[in-house]
């Protein structure tokens, strides 16, 4: 007698999430212990792929979208309400979105090697670092962290954002397509600072016992970065997909996030974080655009950045 075929849950996620050092492998094995299913991660860029596939996407779940691109993602019309209790979330701001469910969060920040320079405490201090101190950033057209920086600068400087980029340009060693390449240049010693997140130093402390990498905390406030999950409307595995969305808020999932995705878990309080995270300095305030504001201003903000850096 043939064995019944177990269902497959297809989850789209970024490369870093599914890599051997990311949370993907452990999440896969833990969920499969209880779901009687085969969880298959499909790694790669998310939004361009979803735009291309539209209603024909093979995904049941999408993991790794962020708040600066949710307007575009929402307008695709391919997601259904998650139907989970948002009050279970422990975030620095209220969350009432019915489509997108955060699974982790952090703040955009510049991380510096303190053996090379003292981290600046403001955007203006960043400009005034010694001439030999260089930073690496990511391209906002291909990187969600790069986009967060563009919007962060735009929120702080408004109509003067282009002028700020002109002043910062000499400090930028290079612009990379993605976060991994930029962070690699930083850890290889090519630059003293890199655009990353306030939680990034936790990796160096916990894994390398290196306390020389520190996030610069700016007095102007920092741009929050939420990573999101969404359930695909056309999924043939609606029950499994709903189970996975529940799983995201469970301690089993949330416990994995800090030490594999190096971010704060979305459904746990500070008391539940590993001590290396609860001890990290955090910004006193968050500055950000709403979903609609970010969608409306992104093109202009990128153009100001591009024009300034091409001069």
Feature map (PLM): residue ranges:
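Extracytoplasmic ligand-binding site segments that recognize negatively charged/polar headgroups
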Residues: 6-8, 12-23, 48, 57-191
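Short alpha-helix C-terminal cap/hinge motif
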Residues: 24-39
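A ligand-binding cleft/hinge motif common to bilobed small-molecule-binding domains
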Residues: 68-72, 187, 191-212, 261
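Short beta-strand->loop
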Residues: 79-86, 98-102, 124-127, 205-223, ...
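Periplasmic-binding protein-like
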Residues: 89-93, 106, 165-169, 175-176, ...
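A bilobed periplasmic-binding-protein/Venus flytrap-type ligand-binding module shared by bacterial periplasmic
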Residues: 109-116, 154, 225-238, 256-259
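Mature extracytoplasmic/periplasmic domains
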Residues: 232-289
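Extracellular/periplasmic bilobal clamshell ligand-binding domains
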Residues: 274-311
